[in-house]
A protein has these predicted regions:
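Acetyl-CoA-dependent GNAT
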Residues: 1-23, 28-29, 41-43, 47, ...
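Conserved G/P- and acidic residue-centered "switch" motifs that form tight phosphate/ATP-binding loops
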Residues: 35, 52
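Short polybasic/polar patches that bind polyanions
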Residues: 32, 49, 72
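Residues within alpha-helical segments
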Residues: 42-45, 49, 61, 68
Length: 108
């Protein structure tokens, strides 16, 4: 929010057990270039991790190159469509939130 105007938004939903889906990341054009998208995405990643999700998924339009670059920088990787998305128009991403291994320390 800037001067009472909402300039950016983001949401997430539970997609499946252990899987969050990032939704609706949007920054108004006049406010782009100020890292608001990155801040919002990092916030959702941290919230979903703290809430115990194992991974977070999202989709974006093929032409949204800046968004795709941001997702790569945040550690997302491309995955096949997961919810009847049109692969000609939509690119899907995933990021692991929880470590998939456990460390056991044994005294010698």
């Amino acid at each position: 929010e800037t001067d009472g105007e909402i300039v950016a938004c983001i949401a997430y939903r539970t997609f499946a057990p252990g899987v969050a889906e990032m939704k609706r990341l949007y920054v108004k054009p006049a406010h782009r270039g100020r890292h608001l998208g990155r801040i919002l995405a990092e916030t959702i990643i941290n919230i979903t991790r703290e809430r115990g999700f194992d991974k977070i998924i999202l989709d974006t339009m093929v032409e949204m190159k800046a968004a795709q670059q941001l997702y790569h920088q945040l550690g997302f990787y491309m995955i096949p469509p997961y919810d009847d998305q049109d692969p000609e128009r939509i690119v899907c991403y995933e990021k692991q939130l929880q470590a998939k291994f456990h460390v056991k320390i044994v005294a010698a």
